[in-house]
Amino acid sequence: EFGDAKQWPAQHYASVSSQLIGKGWQVWIMGSGKDNDVASHILRELVESEREHCYDLTGKTSLAQAIDLMSVAKAVVSNDSGLMHVAAALGRPVVAMYGSSSADFTPPLTDQVQLLSIDIDCRPCFERVCPLGHKRCLVDLSPELALSALARLVNIEQSTQEGSSAADESSAGEHGTFCES
């Protein structure tokens, strides 16, 4: 695990999750067992009816299973992480959050990507923990910015098809088809 300087805030993931669930999506939270606390935080931020459509898979899947799930996800919203690169390799649309790191050095290898970062003096610092203690490089990447980026990649509006499968309406991230790690 790199450290929290690459981890988009759980409340931001929760906000994006809530809005997508409201549009008929399912959300899969993915990552290692070390991401359990973040996944729990995301779930706590959701109202009870939304939690029924948000699945915490952190620490519950093998890498092969995570790859299988991401291969059928509609999109992935993720930190700069290993699973984000896997999603890109699978050809899934990816919204990638870059905090302390830089896409100039570790870009996802896909053309179906929206790279999100902000231009502040201390970024990129490439540190595992924010040396200034504020994590503005991630905190200031708003959920609205992520949703706008996602909408440039896929239709995020509710599906009108009856009987569409869960896989057809899924969002992915490491924290998801939200990715954490």
Question: PLM ranges: what are they?
Answer:
Residues 1-3:
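Conserved donor-binding/catalytic core segment of Leloir-type glycosyltransferases
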Residues 6, 39, 135:
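Short acidic, gly/pro-rich beta-turn/loop elements at beta-sheet edges
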Residues 6-9, 139:
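Short, conserved glycine- and acidic-residue-centered signature motifs
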Residues 7, 66-70, 76, 80, ...:
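Aromatic-residue detector
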Residues 9-99:
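Donor-binding and catalytic core of enzymes assembling or modifying cell-surface/extracellular glycoconjugates
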Residues 43, 53-57, 88-158, 162, ...:
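Nucleotide-sugar donor-binding patch of glycosyltransferase catalytic domains
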